[in-house]
From Swiss-Prot:
Keywords: ATP synthesis, Cell inner membrane, Cell membrane, CF(1), Hydrogen ion transport, Ion transport, Membrane, Transport
Main location: membrane
Native organism taxonomy: Bacteria, Pseudomonadati, Pseudomonadota, Gammaproteobacteria, Moraxellales
Keyword Cell inner membrane: yes
Protein name (record): ATP synthase gamma chain
Native source organism of the sequence: Psychrobacter arcticus (strain DSM 17307 / VKM B-2377 / 273-4)
Family, per entry: Belongs to the ATPase gamma chain family.
Primary gene name: atpG
Pfam families recorded: ATP-synt
InterPro entries xrefs: ATP_synth_F1_ATPase_gsu, ATP_synth_F1_gsu, ATP_synth_F1_gsu_CS
Protein's cellular compartments: Cell inner membrane
Record-level GO BP terms: proton motive force-driven plasma membrane ATP synthesis
């Protein structure tokens, strides 16, 4: 059994760690709130872009952009969004489990896969897991820009346009609330029919207006679809950042609480040992006094 000195040293060490985890919990809570705000701010842009594209698509039923045309699937691409840092509970592990399940389903159909990665944890995962990584971005921080995240998106879209891949997915942790983050795999290209389904009812009425499109509908669709896809990926990154901070906050709170429980247990052991030592000393004194008398 450990001595009183060893237990005191262990309690001191755990208290020091507890201070760190409590501080990390508070920092993560603050960052989570800011990430939520940025996540909410980005949504109107994507919604507005979707409405504009819906108008264009319905106004030009004779033109189908390649990003909207389904074709036989021989190879798929995944844009995988992870965190740069750890200490976020099972956030990245749960995402990788969902990803590997999806990959396995395609492999069972003899469909190959390639990957574009955002986040250092994803890069580390694929070094061990294997797989063809065409592009990677790390150290994107808490407030990434479109320019920082653009290369993986463009690499995937270029491969799709060249016929190297036939479907693109975006993989990220969807922020549900502070306690819940959901690993999510959404089809990005070709754009699923549901992408503009919410706009259809309103568009039928609005199309009675006579719109003038400049320079022309085809050019606008070609330009806006790429930006729309970029906005979807950017929004997914913001959701993943909020998920990362909320998961870290929960993990650090659990670590802080566990440290408190461990300190209490050690303190109880310490008190019992100290009481036993005092009792033993008293017994020795009483025994010595009896022997002298």
């Amino acid at each position: 059994m450990a001595s009183l000195k060893e237990i005191r040293a262990k309690v001191t060490s755990i208290k020091s760690t507890q201070k760190i985890t409590r501080a990390m919990q508070m920092v993560a809570a603050s960052k989570m709130r800011r990430a939520q705000e940025r996540m909410e701010v980005g949504r109107p842009y994507a919604d507005s872009m979707r409405r504009v594209i819906s108008h264009l698509v319905h106004a030009s039923s004779d033109y189908k952009h390649p990003y909207m045309v389904n074709r036989p699937v021989n190879k798929v691409g995944y844009i995988v969004i992870t965190s740069d840092r750890g200490l976020a509970g099972g956030l990245n592990i749960n995402l990788f489990k969902a990803l590997t399940k999806s990959i396995q389903q395609y492999q069972d159909q003899s469909v190959q896969a390639e990957f574009a990665v955002i986040g250092a944890k994803g890069v580390s995962f694929f070094k061990n897991f294997g797989g063809k990584v065409t592009s990677a971005v790390t150290d994107y921080g808490d407030k990434p820009t479109f320019e920082q995240l653009n290369s993986p998106v463009q690499a995937m879209l270029e491969d799709y346009s060249n016929g190297k891949i036939d479907r693109i997915y975006v993989v990220y942790n969807k922020f549900v609330n502070a306690m819940t983050q959901k690993p999510t795999i959404n089809q990005l290209v070709p754009l699923p029919d549901s992408a503009f389904a919410e706009e259809e009812s309103g568009i039928q009425t609005e199309l009675s207006w006579d719109y003038i499109y400049e320079p022309d509908i085809k050019t606008l669709i070609d330009e806006l679809l790429g930006r729309y896809i970029e906005s979807i990926v950017y929004q997914a990154v913001m959701e993943n950042i909020a998920s990362e901070q909320s998961s870290r906050m929960v993990a650090m709170k659990a670590a802080t609480d566990n440290a408190g429980d461990l300190i209490n247990d050690l303190q109880l052991v310490y008190n019992k040992l100290r009481q036993a030592a005092i009792t033993r000393e008293i017994s020795e004194i009483v025994g010595g006094a009896a022997a002298v008398s």
